Amino acid sequence: MERKNPSRESPRRLSAKVGKGTEMKKVARQLGMAAAESDKDSGFSDGSSECLSSAEQMESEDMLSALGWSREDRPRQNSKTAKNAFPTLSPMVVMKNVLVKQGSSSSQLQSWTVQPSFEVISAQPQLLFLHPPVPSPVSPCHTGEKKSDSRNYLPILNSYTKIAPHPGKRGLSLGPEEKGTSGVQKKICTERLGPSLSSSEPTKAGAVPSSPSTPAPPSAKLAEDSALQGVPSLVAGGSPQTLQPVSSSHVAKAPSLTFASPASPVCASDSTLHGLESNSPLSPLSANYSSPLWAAEHLCRSPDIFSEQRQSKHRRFQNTLVVLHKSGLLEITLKTKELIRQNQATQVELDQLKEQTQLFIEATKSRAPQAWAKLQASLTPGSSNTGSDLEAFSDHPAI
């Protein structure tokens, strides 16, 4: 058997293997470049895969060192320069070799291929300042004021009309103590009206005998009850010893009251009360009749007999009488009552006259003695009634 010489065949085989390896490397490079070009053309290339080589990184570091920047001081220098140049801006962001593309608004330039949003370029690093939206500073004092306003805000208060009194914040913040003091002040003001009117004129000596031991006469109690009920009592005579209750018929017959009594200090203090009867169209009764003001004043001067509550009632009644007289409502009320009484009396007379007229017509038609007797019987009691009515009307003047 012939043995092959390995020394002769090995260099050829090795050279063939090396040639095949170099060819395969070339083919791989060509395929890689073609794939990269196809990816770039199709638009699906990834920029992150194309990293910088070590040589390019060394070149960028050399350029930064030539500019005076070091690798460790780079963020400090960037922040310092940004703060010095633009104190109001935020720290800058360094983007290496990346160019951000702006999107075109025109629809004609749009294509079917997908375009990348950024492109890797070989140039110096670019600095982009990003401005975050900074909200306006809000002071804490304004927020506190808003909170306090929101607590006191009531939409009902703003709906009041202009003519109505708008309630303020002070009225809402009133405590129970302040409300109590205001009520006490109102009570004091109402109680001061009575003593001021009664003490305006000094009392005459011997006019009203007031002693704690002597009880009040029953006539005074009757006059007081009638005064509290709102019926003006007419006292006959000017002396307080002759107090007499008057019936409601006499009260209704009196068209107005005489305020010229010498024993009434309230009437003496008011000049408008005197001479009222001379100006009124309906002349009242004689001057001997007194007003209910005198009775109220006389009853108010006996504190030992009546309690404080009844005295306050008398004071209020007295003040009411004075106010009604000054405004003229008291005279108007009395005149209205008198007119109502006269109207009722006239209506009764008209009814009687109609009945008598009907009887007279029946008697004339039938000519019967019974009808005439009935007519005569109706006229006999009617004549006495008419006479009494005429006497009642004679006490008062014609209107």
Swiss-Prot record:
User: Which residue stretches belong to region Disordered?
Assistant: 1-85, 162-224, 378-399
Q: Compositionally biased, Polar residues: which spans?
A: 378-388
What Pfam families does the annotation carry? Answer: CiPC (PF15800)
Location in the cell reads:
Nucleus; Cytoplasm, Cytosol
Where does the motif Nuclear localization signal lie? 186-187
Q: Which stretches does UniProt call biased (Basic and acidic residues)? A: 1-12
**Taxonomic superkingdom:** Eukaryota
Offer a single GO CC term for the protein: nucleolus
Q: Which residues carry this modification: Phosphoserine?
A: S213
Q: What is the effect of changing K187A?
A: Loss of predominant localization in the nucleus. No effect on CAD- AND HSPA5-binding
Q: Which InterPro entries match?
A: CIPC
Sorted alphabetically, the keyword list is: Biological rhythms, Coiled coil, Cytoplasm, Nucleus, Phosphoprotein, Repressor, Transcription, Transcription regulation
| GO BP term, example | rhythmic process
Q: Which residues form a coiled coil?
A: 333-359
**What is its quaternary makeup?**
Interacts with CLOCK. Forms a ternary complex with the CLOCK-BMAL1 heterodimer. Interacts with CAD and HSPA5.
Function summary? Transcriptional repressor which may act as a negative-feedback regulator of CLOCK-BMAL1 transcriptional activity in the circadian-clock mechanism. May stimulate BMAL1-dependent phosphorylation of CLOCK. However, the physiological relevance of these observations is unsure, since experiments in an animal model showed that CIPC is not critially required for basic circadian clock.
Q: Write down what this protein is called.
A: CLOCK-interacting pacemaker
Q: Which gene encodes it?
A: CIPC
